[in-house]
Amino acid sequence: LVNAGGDLLHRGGEPITVGIEDPRRPFDNVPPLTRVTLADGGLASSSGARRPLRVGTAVFSHVLDPRTGWPVEHTLAATTIAPDAATADVATTVVGVLAVGEALAFADATDGLACHLLDCCGGQHSSRRWPRFGAPDGSERPQASAR
């Protein structure tokens, strides 16, 4: 297991359980937003919780939509699982910028990619390949996902 600033790469051995931070409660020792079992591959998450952009009294996400130049507001957090950590890192930014429906379609159409999103209203959304916590084969969707 390699942890590079929160982006993970896991190769071989037993699957690990990863708790995904809830950006609405970015504190130590609070329950995670969700959990996922990572068997082999990379995992990356992105949210505005740890690196907000402050302009005067306003607080924005540090993730900017390259199409508009403005901070993303519709997605509070994005997490992806991919074959490696670098791909997961890039894919997390992509799905975090896209609208939720577009992000899920992108993940479903991309081999080896799965994503989990928290939208601005608190809804959780998962792509088809997002593994359910406790299912080592990753064959089932999370019970808590809404789509």
Where are these regions (language model features)?
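Mature catalytic core of soluble alpha/beta enzymes
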Residues: L1-R147
